Amino acid sequence: MEQTEQNDIEQTLVLIKPDALKNSLTGYVLSQLSEFHTGLRFAATKIVHVSSMLAGEHYAEHRGKFFFASLLDYIQGRLHYPKEPWKRRVIAIIYQGPKAVSRVRELCGPTNPHKARDEKPGCIRSLGTLEIIKDASGKVLGERMDNLIHASANTADAERELKLWFKPNDIPPAMHPYATEVSKSNYYFKDGKLYDTYDAGRFCVLATGDLGWKSDIEALGRLLRGEPSAVPVESVVAKYLINEHQED
């Protein structure tokens, strides 16, 4: 592959979050990220009811922090649609093109909405807000940033996040950014465990002949054999469970 083609296939994950949807900012966000403004194009998109598993894996780096639970409620739409669970969703998009990660990050602006307004007025996140987080007694613990949009921070994060949210067959074959492989085994999942045979209640993640990310198939094999894996089973499985069940 020529160098220009390699650069052209850089991809990044964008999530239009529940607060943007609640405030009817979807059209604005999409117009800001249009090919006219960014030189980037869609590689894939989907409407996602975000499960607890998917939310937890997406924000895994924040596990254990005081705002983690609130962050999960935020991305799952529980905070903006407390009595309307059918409206809880995000729009997940893969953008592709030269310098995709940095171009989208530039348009989004700083993560903190107040900082975004001060340093880059007019950017997408300048329309966001900060929300106070309190414990059960009412004590203020800190703030949560409701900043409308997620964008991969770097190419390594982009790879992890794309593989977390999207299967290879969600993306046109010519736009696959990472190696794929045909599964030679069956993999089933139930209650945090992997199996290679079907039983009642087990969900089929990959069947023999299915196409998967090569790194996922390697991780599934290691996990099934009880070997250490840098990729937790939830990070592989979460995308296959997208929109399978509605969480209250």
Report the location of each language-model feature.
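Non-catalytic terminal and connector segments of soluble metabolic enzymes
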Residues: 1-248
